[in-house]
Amino acid sequence: MKKIYLDNAATTPVSPEILAAMEPYFTNKFGNASEPHFWGQEARKAIDEAREKIANFLGAKPKEIIFTSCATESINLAHKGLIESIKYQVSSIKYPHIITSRVEHKAVLETCKHLEKIGWVKVTYLPVDKYGIVDIKDIRQAIRPETVLVSIMYTNNEVGTIEPIGKIGRLIKEINVSRVACHLSPVYFHTDATQAIQYLDCNVDGLGIDLLSFSGHKLYAPKGIGALYIRSGVPFVRQQDGGGQEYNLRAGTENVPYIVALGKAIELVEQNKVHSTKCIEKLKSKLIDGVLKISGVKLVGHPTNQAPHIATFIVEGAEGEAMLLLLSDKGIAASSGSACTSGLLKPSHVLTAMGYKPQEAHGSLRFSLGKDTTLKEIDYVVKVLPEVIKKLRKMAPKLI
């Protein structure tokens, strides 16, 4: 049976080049980077080189890059580190105010909810339009004297919509000019760039970003490594106590092989971005054309402001999880916006925020392409999917 992996927005396989770069740091180059001897110096050099690669890619300084275990930790660190610092350093702000959107990754939404629950912050959750895009005007109107953080994802992981990050960055920069004149705390801008960093411009100065999170396992590096960019001057308190690693902002012995992997992943992104993006866009276009020939299927997300690798559909008369199981039987791995939680099938919070009814959201199907996706694989999916949908639609009346 053919095996076709179209769930690259969930995770990617580790590339051979990255695995080869990591391997020496599991065996011969095993030193602790905090030690002054040869092995420690060797490990420290590897970390410094990886940090510099990532900093150069983002247009940042090496000391502004903090290594974490994943994007979720990076997001938690960004929000909690900033809020705790402001809460205890700016006495005039009793409840720091965060602005985010209803379509963020759960790492952002649950972190904000936690900070609300413990009484540290007030949060505004902005609506989105039918494409999943936040209105710049809504951000402007939501900003108040206590606002300290705007956190909007760069590219949505479920539907691929690209948010107007550059425009948001310029808006915040403009607002901060007047806030400084009024002796108010600046508003800082965080973005979750996990789905964007492989394909889109992530220059932090050009976009006006103060904090940026991403993960390695979406870049063909292993699970267990991520990073947080923190602009110099952003108030910040570490959330993990211990040694002074990561510029005293994230304690713990550095995971050298995985840091090397992340540096190598970014190096490969920089080398291959243009070619890879063009190839994936062509394959995605063919996939969309083929899938939309099926009756009762519609494409979700913005028609043009869209990540090159994600294509999400809503299929009338077919449930997402059931489609995944039947596709898996055919050797195809995909994803759905619905997730099984506590025995109850809950519709995607992203799709419902975009205005889709729960029943529609349950019929979502996401294909996410990668560098190894081929034309033959797309042709096979386009051939098999109509059969799967037809089978489920025939079964549907019997299940009611």
Where are these regions (language model features)?
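Pyridoxal 5′-phosphate
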Residues: 1-400
